[in-house]
Amino acid sequence: MVAVLFIVFLVALAIGVPVAFSLGLASVAYMLGAHIQMINFAQYFFKGLDSFTLLCIPGFTFAGNLMNQGGISDKLLDFADALVGHVTGGLAYANVLASMVFAGISGTALSDTVALGGVEIPMMVNQGYDVPFSVAITAASSCLGPIIPPSVPMIMAATMTGLSVSKMFMAGIVPGLLLGLGMCATCYILSVKRHYPKRDKRASLAHVLHATKEAIWALIMVAIILFGIMGGIVTPTEASIICVVYGLFVAVFIYRKMGPKEMYSCLRDTVSSASAIMALVAFANVFAFILTKEHIPSMIADAMLRLTSNKYLILLLINLFLIFVGMFMETIAAILILFPTLLAVATAVGVDPIQFGIIVVMNLVLGLCTPPVGVCLFAATNIGARYGKCTLSDSVKALVPLLIINFGVLFLVTYVPFLTVGVANLVMG
């Protein structure tokens, strides 16, 4: 019956059925064939949703939508440009810096690409950067969204396996910063080599102060999330609710851009995004129940450990496998299906679960800007094509130097535990 489970799942995916419903159809087919009472389907479906931690997903999504409604993308980019726009390749740095701050609000990569890309790409093109490079740095920097907290994929990974969401958030900070610094270094080298422009002089103090004043409301939200969770003052779910109240206050009373029409748009987008994730979680929990019942995770773990018991080689194999999976499968779906199984392998060779969670998230998130199914790359390319010649192959060529740096940081995080779990333990004890 295990063969039926996987055949139905793969066939459903192949004919275009959404991942969540493919998992559900495969689970139903297995249960009917194995004569398992369907009440088990309902029980495990709702058990997957019965989590206080999962409430922070609609919370952070709604808070990000509220802030974005106030035009936060323009304000963040202007703030970043005021700080670094005067150096060679300054606007490329500003692109990365804005994504790092926006990551602390949205928690997703695609929202970063769409919200910031519509502002960043035309601004870079107008200042003399070529379109493919503008697209590449926008797509690559948007991958910081699910790595710098809050992170929806991290919430999923932690919830599925009973790990601490707060600790995983803290473990993602240093890898996110390293990715940002690596991208900035790459931008500098390419900017010097290609003679990309820079602003003639530093922004005036008045301009910097004005840009900071405009962006301060977004920076405060990031501080609420990081320091509230890091200090043990609030849980991630409580932090998300505080951010919703704060975001609503800023959108209505500070930015003054929130009317009934805008509120409806924010609520609609939040419900659409959150419900899709929740459906995936619920169906994946039923699928995971079947895999556990058939001892699939332990069989995979035993097979890999028979191949080699070397921790470093196991991590290398898992990295290569996840990079491949990330090129084809949506991040959250891959985490829900694969993470519990691979975690059993990793812990068997002595890898810390929190460190492994960051490794898995980074691998799959980097797939968002790699072909053939890199949604962030597609979105950024579509935006860039409005402002000049830019095909998908052009974007991929421009992306290669950034991907080399990103994968370099990934392997550094894989083999230096202090960068993840070490920092988390220092901060949270």
Tell me what each language-model feature is.
Residues 1-429:
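Alpha-helical transmembrane segments of multi-pass membrane transport proteins
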